[in-house]
Amino acid sequence: MAFSQAVSGLNAAATNLDVIGNNIANSATYGFKSGTASFADMFAGSKVGLGVKVAGITQDFTDGTTTNTGRGLDVAISQNGFFRLVDSNGSVFYSRNGQFKLDENRNLVNMQGLQLTGYPATGTPPTIQQGANPTNISIPNTLMAAKTTTTASMQINLNSSDPLPTVTPFSASNADSYNKKGSVTVFDSQGNAHDMSVYFVKTGDNNWQVYTQDSSDPNSIAKTATTLEFNANGTLVDGAMANNIATGAINGAEPATFSLSFLNSMQQNTGANNIVATTQNGYKPGDLVSYQINDDGTVVGNYSNEQTQLLGQIVLANFANNEGLASEGDNVWSATQSSGVALLGTAGTGNFGTLTNGALEASNVDLSKELVNMIVAQRNYQSNAQTIKTQDQILNTLVNLR
């Protein structure tokens, strides 16, 4: 009799419809991977066979389309890799859904509250400790401390045809006693800004005396910093570095002592004296104003003092057999013996995929394909139901024989 075969066919077709329906339902779920039901025949010493059974349900881990969102805490994985997440009990899960937010403790978590893990940033300035044990990534709402200026630079083009100043000796209060005045802003231990005036006084052919004065300190006086010496070609050959330049003391802060470099400065016989560029390595304190995840997985904070600071780096996990992962719901998986242990690393290194900031990986469900599969599964279900109906008619014929 074909009742058992038909019932097994109905059960298999129903399971197939469940899988297809689940795919369609999750066609808009970020990071979702479509499933496929596999079947096998049942055989028990008879060539006729005993029907069909579900051999297993596999998932397709090919990439979904990368969809731009513009949100700073959204990040999409392309090719290999999973985000590594931990729950409050320390259990580890893996996901392809890169939608993250901040919890009440300012930890980066997914929408279910699982904490995103990565390599920590430590030291001053912070650097990523790759290879360390992954830990939760947080974005602390703390003030960035001020940094005292220790080095500064000024690139200047001086006119060799400039006459000597008409007034001697040099006086910062008399513009006729110098040829050019510039400035560079530096910072002390509390982040107080000091406007350091730099004066250039031509003392002879190819020679210029440089003086500095802290214009922010009313008690400051101009001091000799260095003597610039140029060769006949206008190239700076001596005096390129002025050391131990000190600021005044403001608001009880320790004065900053820094070096001032004039490398790449030139002397030419045309054009006005011109300061090309100034730089320095200090800054004032700053509040966190924004943050984002970069394409290399680094989490960066942006501060009101126009500085950035590394806060951590997202770690990715790879497996020898993705299909061996166990689905745990909420769009996460856990490792199994079949999947193998997780291999950890960072985006763009080794066999790990790349990250796209401000984007999410869409579901890899092909709706057109799933709708066709649903029609086929429905016909399969109807055909097995028809087998039962036909078998019933045959039994009725036998019962009615006289």
Swiss-Prot record:
Pfam annotation, one family: Flg_bbr_C
Transmembrane segments: none
GO cellular component, one term: cytosol
Superkingdom of the source species: Bacteria
Entry annotated with the keyword Transcription regulation: no
Glycoprotein found in the keyword field: no
Intracellular or extracellular location(s): Bacterial flagellum basal body
Keywords: Bacterial flagellum
A single GO BP: bacterial-type flagellum-dependent swarming motility
Similarity remark: Belongs to the flagella basal body rod proteins family.
Protein name: Flagellar hook protein FlgE
Gene responsible for this protein: flgE
